[in-house]
């Protein structure tokens, strides 16, 4: 399928600029560029309540429906950014829209970024963040039996590994996982890394340079570096995966779906056509992004439905 019109314009501009490389950007410029791109999310959702809090030394953003009270189904969200960028500012509108459309609470976890903080800092923060939320569930208005872990790109990776850590520690488990074009394979061994790796804005170079900064001396086949290849998925809650047609990560997301099912995990996977990596944050120009937003919100409202 052809690229959506708005996304095609982004791709054409990227190619016309001779495919600028994230690898040669200063990290501050890379982060600033990501924040600047948030304008493409569309009109800011204002019909929600937003609160930034610190609990047990970690920072969270809580977004709630305007009249929310009591214990609500809750989405715990990890932002993308290749482990080196992103945060509340880059994902603010997505968090707001998810809360509005789902009628649920949304809590974003701020984890430490590379290159200042290398592996396992983000993984440890992701796990610690959900444990803090779970411990304070009643205080935060969270229905602990209806928690969804979700994230995009690096955040999808963290959601998956966090659920695996919770399972290994025989701790509580979320009701479901929603993984939005997750980064899963540091070895970059899938064919879509080649077919979609150069022209579609978020390139193979973008993704691998993030891995290189965060994983540094960690082997590519470490189970937390490349969770795609793990054999301990059995016992995870239901998983829903979103992939994008023109994404270098498309094939590994779809491979994860097959591997989950082979290991007895309930899994579903939807490929969104005509879009690129990062499309979920492009609701201002992408119909697929708006459709994905509403679908995810529907799933969060009734986990396991």
Where are these regions (language model features)?
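A glycine/proline-hinged amphipathic helix-loop "lid/cap" segment
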Residues: 1-67, 305
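Short beta-strand element of the alpha/beta-hydrolase
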Residues: 71-81
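Gly/Ser-rich "nucleophile elbow"/oxyanion-hole loop immediately N-terminal to the catalytic nucleophile
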Residues: 134-149
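Hydrolase active-site cap/lid region
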Residues: 164-219
């Amino acid at each position: 399928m052809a690229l959506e019109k708005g996304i095609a314009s982004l791709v054409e501009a990227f190619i016309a600029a001779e495919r600028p490389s994230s690898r040669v950007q200063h990290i501050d410029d890379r982060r600033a560029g990501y924040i600047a791109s948030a304008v493409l999310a569309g009109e800011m959702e204002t019909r929600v309540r937003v609160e930034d809090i610190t609990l047990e030394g970690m920072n969270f953003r809580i977004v709630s429906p305007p009249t929310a009270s009591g214990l609500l189904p809750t989405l715990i969200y990890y932002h993308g950014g290749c482990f080196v960028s992103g945060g509340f500012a880059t994902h603010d509108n997505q968090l707001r829209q998810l809360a509005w459309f789902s009628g649920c609470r949304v809590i974003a976890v701020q984890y430490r970024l590379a290159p200042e903080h290398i592996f396992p800092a983000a993984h440890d923060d992701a796990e610690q963040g959900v444990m803090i939320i779970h411990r304070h569930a009643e205080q935060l208005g969270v229905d602990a039996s209806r928690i969804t872990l979700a994230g995009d790109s690096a955040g999808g990776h963290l959601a998956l590994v966090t659920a695996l850590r919770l399972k290994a520690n025989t701790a509580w488990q979320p009701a479901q996982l929603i993984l939005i074009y997750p980064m899963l394979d540091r070895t970059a061994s899938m064919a879509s890394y080649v077919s979609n790796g150069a022209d579609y804005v978020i390139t193979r170079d973008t993704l691998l340079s993030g891995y290189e900064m965060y994983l540094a001396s960690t082997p590519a086949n470490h189970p937390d570096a490349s969770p795609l290849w793990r054999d301990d998925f059995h016992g995870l809650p239901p998983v829903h995966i979103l992939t994008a047609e023109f994404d270098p990560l498309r094939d590994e997301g779809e491979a994860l779906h097959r591997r989950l099912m082979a290991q007895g995990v309930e899994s579903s996977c939807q490929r969104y056509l005509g879009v690129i990596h990062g499309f979920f944050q492009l609701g201002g120009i992408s119909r697929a992004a708006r459709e994905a937003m509403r679908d995810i919100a529907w799933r969060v409202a009734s986990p396991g439905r």
